[in-house]
Amino acid sequence: MDNLKKIRKNNKLTHQDMAEKLKISKAFYWQIENGKRRLSYLMAVKIAKIFNKKPDEIFYEEHKNKD
């Protein structure tokens, strides 16, 4: 989820900011960003909307670059 962290920081948002926008706890968001919790498709869509992106632009690019 390095791409997510990079995008979040580039937009000057904190873990707390993201948690509030997503209506989840800060700890839950931290777990998502750090790969400790599985990311549902619905949550990926919600996160992508915050940055006006498609989920693939944030999450799929990491896997694509590893191939």
Description of each model-found segment:
Residues 2-21:
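Short basic helix-loop element that most often maps to the first helix and adjoining turn
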Residues 17, 28, 57:
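Residues in the helix-turn-helix
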Residues 4, 15, 26, 41-44:
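Helix-turn-helix DNA-binding elements, focusing on the entry/boundary residues of the two helices
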Residues 7-12, 42, 49, 57-67:
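Short, charged recognition helix plus adjacent turn
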Residues 7, 21-22, 32, 61:
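Residues in the recognition helix of alpha-helical DNA-binding motifs
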Residues 33, 43, 51:
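DNA major-groove recognition helix of helix-turn-helix
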Residues 24-37:
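Recognition helix of helix-turn-helix/homeodomain-like DNA-binding domains
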